Every structure is written in C-alpha cells, then in structure tokens.
UniProtKB/Swiss-Prot annotation:
Listed name of the protein: Small ribosomal subunit protein uS10
UniProt keyword Ribonucleoprotein present: yes
Annotated function: Involved in the binding of tRNA to the ribosomes.
PROSITE patterns xref list: RIBOSOMAL_S10 (PS00361)
Domain of life: Bacteria
SUPFAM superfamilies on file: Ribosomal protein S10
Keyword entries, A-Z: Ribonucleoprotein, Ribosomal protein
Organism: Bartonella quintana (strain Toulouse) (Rochalimaea quintana)
C-alpha cells in the first residue's frame, strides 16, 4: 500500500493556545488509529517595530514593540479515512492558523 502523510503546520501569536490545539489534534489522530510524529517546534518569528514616543520631537526617545509568531509541525503517517473525517470536524481556537498538506 502507498504510504501517505498529512503534514499540519500551526501558527499562533500565543503559544498556550497553540499547544492546546496541538494536543487536540494529536489526541484525535491517535484515537482514530493514525501514527503521529511531532509536535515539532519550529523557529519563532519575531518582528520588532520601533516608533517615536513623542509626536514631533525627541528622536532619541523611542519605544519598541514586538510580535512573536510561534509555529508547530505535525506529521500524521498512514491516516485512516476516520482520521481525515475527525480532523475536518475538529474545532480549534480562533487564534490558530492551520495549513494542511497532503
């Protein structure tokens, strides 16, 4: 039989929501009889923004903000049709971006 993998990539700003969603996906996949590799933590993307504190003067006075994007990778090896159905019906948190590649 041809081995097929499902690769799931998750992104979120809050790592706690991301880890909870990852646990949900792993438990659903294992419950339906699939083999799961991961979660593999990928590098966190950090974007920094520097802005002036004052509206028109004091170039030396600045403030920095940062936005962190956390990422995880899951591989589901040899998924059953029940696994695919269960993953499609799974309701994850609103702050998690999910990319699925077959």
């Amino acid at each position: 039989m041809n081995s097929q993998n499902i690769r799931i990539r998750l992104k979120a700003f809050d790592h706690r929501i991301l880890d909870a969603s990852t646990r949900e996906i792993v438990s659903t996949a294992k419950r339906t009889g699939a083999n799961v590799r991961g979660p593999i933590p990928l590098p966190t993307r950090i974007e920094k923004f520097t802005v002036n504190r004052g509206p028109h003067i004091d170039k030396k006075s600045r403030e920095q903000f940062e936005m962190r994007t956390h990422k995880r990778l899951l591989d589901i090896v040899d998924p059953t049709p029940q696994t695919v159905d269960a993953l499609m019906k799974l309701d994850l948190s609103a702050g998690v971006d999910v990319e699925i590649k077959l």
